[in-house]
Structures are given as structure tokens and as C-alpha cells.
UniProtKB/Swiss-Prot annotation:
PANTHER family: RIBOSOMAL PROTEIN S19P FAMILY MEMBER, SMALL RIBOSOMAL SUBUNIT PROTEIN US19M. SUPFAM superfamilies: Ribosomal protein S19 (SSF54570). GO terms for biological process: ribosomal small subunit assembly; translation. It comes from Leifsonia xyli subsp. xyli (strain CTCB07). GO terms for cellular component: cytoplasm; small ribosomal subunit. Disulfide bonds: none annotated. This is Small ribosomal subunit protein uS19. Belongs to the universal ribosomal protein uS19 family. The lineage of its organism: Bacteria, Bacillati, Actinomycetota, Actinomycetes, Micrococcales. Keywords: Ribonucleoprotein, Ribosomal protein, RNA-binding, rRNA-binding. The keyword RNA-binding applies. Protein S19 forms a complex with S13 that binds strongly to the 16S ribosomal RNA.
């Protein structure tokens, strides 16, 4: 169920402060965050935000199409290595 419109978007306060400070300083440095739950707002456009995936920070460049989504959607937490082909060595007849 999506978030109610009357509540507005949720952005962690510490992350929003970093974004506003970067906008005022006209800085394009990478902003490191652990806040995967924060929604992408228009103030973040053009910034690169390094989102933590549980092991390392994955850089995410914010574009217009990402507004309204959450940061965690762009940093997958699980690595898929593919399905195993038929293992004929382990099979007995």
C-alpha cells in the first residue's frame, strides 16, 4: 500500500540536510547514506548518492524519472549468480 498523499514524502532529516548543504554550496560531491527508505525528492536531482546495500555503497545518479521512488530500489541487496547448468559429474546412474 503506498504512502498517504496527505503525509507527504519521507526523507531522513540527516540526508536532506546534506542535500540542501550541497545545493547551497553548488557542490556535486558524492553523498554517502545508509537511508534506503528515503524517497527521492526534486532537491536531489543531479546529485550522486552512494546508497548502502549491506556490504558497500553503490553510487546512484539521481535523474528526473527517479523522483517519487525510494533510494533502496536502485541498490540491490542480493547478487544473483545464475542458475547451475545440468551437473553431469555429480549424477549417479
Amino acid at each position: 500500500m503506498p504512502r498517504s498523499l496527505k503525509k507527504g514524502p519521507f526523507v531522513d532529516e540527516h540526508l536532506f540536510r546534506k542535500v540542501v548543504a550541497a545545493n547551497e554550496a553548488n557542490s556535486k560531491n558524492v553523498i554517502k547514506t545508509w537511508s534506503r527508505r528515503s524517497m527521492i525528492v526534486p532537491a536531489m536531482l543531479g546529485h550522486t548518492i552512494a546508497v548502502h546495500d549491506g556490504r558497500k555503497h553503490i553510487p546512484v545518479f539521481v535523474t528526473e524519472t527517479m523522483v517519487g521512488h525510494k533510494l533502496g530500489e536502485f541498490a540491490p541487496t542480493r547478487t544473483f549468480r545464475g542458475h547451475v547448468k545440468d551437473d553431469k559429474r555429480g549424477r549417479r546412474r
